[in-house]
Amino acid sequence: MRLSLRKTWPAAALGAAGLASAFVLIPGGHPAAPATKLAASSIPQYAHVVVVMEENHSFSDIIGNTTDAPYMNQLADEGALMTSSYAVTHPSDPNYLALFAGNTFGLTADECPLKEGNTANLGSELLAAGYTFKGYSEGLPKAGSTTCTSGNYASKHSPWVNFSNIPAADQQPFSAFPSSSNYASLPTVSWVIPNLNDDMHNGTIQEADTWLDSNLSAYATWATTHDSLLIVTWDEDDYTENNQIPTIFYGQDVAQGQYDENIDHYDVLATLEQMYGLSEVGDSSGETPITDIWN
């Protein structure tokens, strides 16, 4: 049994109404036929997905707080906002691992180094299936660095560093993230981890919002017309038992609105796995992918 602090959502609430129509788009650089639309219960297969993970703030801290987080609220208003999204535990590290590998690995505290070898994870499954993956960490001293901390960089927020099946070349500093003229070169799935000041861990909500706007708003706009997706979520709330967090999907053919099905990191992982036809890893197995937010 996995440790989870999320609420329980009645099964009846996840009925047929939660299966909206969707389309499939083939990742750039992956051999494929032209994009086609599939059955109504499908999940889009985007050319590019960028996942951004913020730190230690609850749903109510962010959503509606247009003074400190105007850009994040713009994304929430224009994209799909999951209003019943929960982290799985405390503290930070196991939540990152839950979203990346479907497992908290029994952690009850942040640890470095945490060596999980070739345990299957989202990145390794993408690579094995012929897709591409990269993790971009702000402040990482160099590609593939195994250092635990360096300035405002902390490896505990970059879960791929814990696995030997993610090549060093796929563990990059954020400075290597493509410029706006070259977003088409992005891997199939990217994770972006701001540093401790820019992800709300040490810095303010306003600082994190400004960083996201400055560094990824151009990608978000580009995504809406280039078969791509941005996911912005949080590792955990501010250490309450409720552990409700914002999760926002923004991009092409995301159906604007608020969605109240109960989700956690495992459900988001399951959605990405089904998006690319990957094997389910860890506790994402049997979880419900998100199917009702797509046009």
What are these regions (language model features)?
Residues M1-P31:
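Secretory targeting and sorting signals
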